[in-house]
């Protein structure tokens, strides 16, 4: 049989071949229930290794520094995904996470919309939509999502995911940080 010709004599296009290879790769690697499936979260890794979260040791995929206990707990709590290199799982330290999140924001930004538009577009309430902080990648809680709506801030589509800012990464505006001058003067007189 000639290369690129199917059994019935039709020729396969290059895109079709790539799609077939991709499907074959996904079918071989990503089959659920396979014993050699690589864990995606820290909890899955703990189950596979039969270790507790307290015993788990991970390195940062970027700087190769060993993660501290708190960093491992945060990685698990924020439901971040493990990266596997040559069969070894890696996490990410907070410094590298912030650095590469900033790069991702600048390189892969798509567009921004308000909360009500996001609800209409996804046909879900904001509470149901997974929105991560674009600085630290922590999933936003309902209070943080509501703060965006209340203050008229937009959610951003970055690399195919919805993002905003968590309370820890929210930078206050100038009026929030500077006290009102009339109130400041009267407080000095009262003291």
UniProtKB/Swiss-Prot annotation:
Its main location: host cell. GO terms for cellular component: host cell cytoplasm; host cell nucleus. It is found in: Host cytoplasm; Host nucleus. A zinc finger (unnamed) spans 60-96, 133-169. Keywords: Activator, DNA-binding, Early protein, Host cytoplasm, Host nucleus, Host-virus interaction, Inhibition of host innate immune response by virus, Metal-binding, Modulation of host cell apoptosis by virus, Transcription, Transcription regulation, Viral immunoevasion, Zinc, Zinc-finger. Plays a major role in the induction and maintenance of cellular transformation. E6 associates with host UBE3A/E6-AP ubiquitin-protein ligase and modulates its activity. Sequesters tumor suppressor TP53 in the host cytoplasm and modulates its activity by interacting with host EP300 that results in the reduction of TP53 acetylation and activation. In turn, apoptosis induced by DNA damage is inhibited. E6 also protects host keratinocytes from apoptosis by mediating the degradation of host BAK1. May also inhibit host immune response. GO terms for molecular function: DNA binding; zinc ion binding. Belongs to the low risk human alphapapillomavirus family. The cancer-causing human papillomavirus E6 protein has a unique carboxy terminal PDZ domain containing substrate but low risk E6s do not possess this domain. Belongs to the papillomaviridae E6 protein family. GO terms for biological process: DNA-templated transcription; regulation of DNA-templated transcription; symbiont-mediated perturbation of host apoptosis; symbiont-mediated perturbation of host ubiquitin-like protein modification; symbiont-mediated suppression of host innate immune response; symbiont-mediated suppression of host type I interferon-mediated signaling pathway. This is Protein E6. The keyword Transcription regulation applies. It comes from Macaca mulata papillomavirus 1. Pfam families: E6. InterPro entries: E6 (IPR001334), E6_sf (IPR038575).
């Amino acid at each position: 049989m000639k290369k690129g010709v199917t059994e019935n004599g039709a020729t396969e296009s290059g895109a079709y071949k790539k799609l077939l290879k991709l499907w074959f790769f996904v079918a071989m690697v990503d089959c659920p229930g396979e014993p050699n499936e690589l864990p995606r979260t820290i909890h899955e890794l703990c189950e596979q290794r039969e270790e507790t979260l307290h015993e788990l040791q991970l390195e940062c995929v970027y700087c190769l520094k060993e993660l501290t206990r708190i960093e491992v707990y945060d990685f698990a709590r924020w439901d971040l995904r493990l990266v596997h290199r040559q069969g070894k799982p890696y996490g990410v330290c907070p410094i590298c996470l912030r650095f590469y999140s900033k790069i991702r924001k600048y390189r892969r930004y798509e567009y921004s919309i308000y909360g009500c538009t996001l609800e209409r577009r996804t046909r879900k309430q904001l509470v149901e939509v997974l929105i991560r902080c674009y600085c630290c990648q922590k999933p936003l809680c309902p209070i943080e999502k509501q703060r965006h709506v209340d203050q008229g801030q937009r959610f951003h589509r970055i690399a195919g995911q919805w993002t905003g800012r968590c309370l820890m990464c929210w930078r206050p505006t100038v009026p929030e940080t500077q006290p009102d001058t009339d109130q400041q003067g009267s407080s000095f007189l009262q003291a």
